[in-house]
Structure formats: C-alpha cells, structure tokens
Amino acid sequence: MLLADGCAGDQQLLSPGSVRQMTTDQLTQSQRDGGRLFLKGQGWGFGGSVDVVAVDPWNVPGRYGWGGGTGTAAHLTPSTGAVTILFTQLAAAGPVPSALMRDFWHFAAGG
C-alpha cells in the first residue's frame, strides 16, 4: 500500500500526500545529530525510520521502515520497489545491528 501511494487493490486507503508525509524525514538536523548513535544516516518519518544518507549498501535514501531493537525489521524502498522483512528472536545488545541483521540487509541490497 505504501509503495502504491496509499492504494490497496482498487481502494485508496491513504492519500498520496499522507504517504509522502509518513515516509519523509520529519527531523531537523539538530534532532538527527542528537540521535546519531541510533540514527546513523537516518531520520524519522511518521511511524518509521527514513534513510537520508547512504551509510551502508542497504541505506538507500528514501528507504522507510522499522529496525527494532528486539530483532525485527521491515523496510520498503520506493526507488526499487523492494520490501524486506526479518523476524528474529535476537534482541539488540546496543546501537549496532547484529551480524545477522547486517548480513540480511547486505543480501537484500544485492550484496
């Protein structure tokens, strides 16, 4: 639905403007700087992170989603149409993603 500008099938559930707002970084530079330990190359839209800088191969500017500290991640990349979902039971021990998550994202990015 988010990749289709708010449409699910033939139903418009969200306006295209709402989808743009959700998936656009809403943080100021100062806020991003304050959260850089956890938001490396990312900002925050409404309900999820938004990649703003290509820090790693999978950080494509515009990628939107959730990289949770409890081992779950779900992202969509509008420029490629890719959707990635990973569910594990490996809670994060700190701000650096686990090797499993990094390997998953690397593979999902075509690496």
For every predicted segment, state its role.
Residues 1-111:
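Catalytic loop of the DD-peptidase/beta-lactamase superfamily, centered on the K-T-G motif
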